[in-house]
């Protein structure tokens, strides 16, 4: 049964097609039960607002420009001049690009950013929101948390959920073993086939399953190179490049409209949707446990804490926010970064994957190298969603975090350098940083 709501992330990033996908610092190619659904190699598709959609828009504008010139020529000199001017403007819009984007797309993203900034300035934080969840609520005001309690078994842990009235998400925290700090990065890979298979369980069709890997380097980048901590970690880092913190979450997102029969069979409404999500989360938890992992479905309080951890919210600010009478806004978006408390973030979209498996880089190694850059924290998000009957759409995002603008700039350069070395194409989401952040929080992935 559900408690009263406390607080849909809608990222505009579209998906890439794959039979499955790359994943965490303990991730690997998924192998399904049938050969047709075997190993995982992403095949890029167009992102919304980029790629194929822009190519079509450019073709239409060029054809329209040519048609205007022809019509003006047929009508006569009086019509040819204005037709030529309009055709020239259309051609410029089709051909000229600013920062790698078409002019219409660039203008659209700029207007969208201004609209979000105006909305943020005029939106107050709802009363009663948990301070741990407040940064996410500032990004998506409709977010609320819920708690589902098992009526028939009071010894079972309650299940926490987050949603905006249109979706519900439950989160599992997954650990490989107690020696993960010194383990080789790919020694215990996450079986992505299990994550993929949970998209459809007992008629429950999930919108997406998201793997989030949150890492903090060892030692922290702000420590001087001659410090004792840096010296002591040098040998360990040379052997394994192990982070100080590596947390893996799997967020399961349910849109009740995708499986109305399953929701109705379990009572309908919010309760029916919660039962569907609990069934899917329990199924994945059981299968991961059987594969040798420790998987815990988070409670409401743990879920809020996980979102705060992923957002790198300052614990001191979070604790003080509960004591103040009038909560102050803790987040701010700019064209190239997003700020939460005194930490700054920049999110990238994975536009091009390298060759994976075989003679190429292994998935666990790729993710580990991208998240090993010197930064306060690095977050890698991978979202799997159904695309047709057999296909799985894959979306990847990477977010780096720094304590200052200078530290963030250094982290950005390090990430871009690491991506080039791994032959991975990443695109900084200029003017789309807030949607990018929402795509990297454990809320269920990009929309």
What are these regions (language model features)?
Residues 47-54, 125-144, 218-228, 352-361:
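Charged, low-complexity, helix/coiled-coil-prone segments
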Residues 69, 170-291:
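An amphipathic, basic-hydrophobic helix/alpha-beta surface used to engage anionic
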Residues 79-83, 95, 99, 103, ...:
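Catalytic cores of large soluble enzymes that bind and process phosphate-bearing ligands
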Residues 95-190, 200:
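N-terminal topogenic membrane-targeting module
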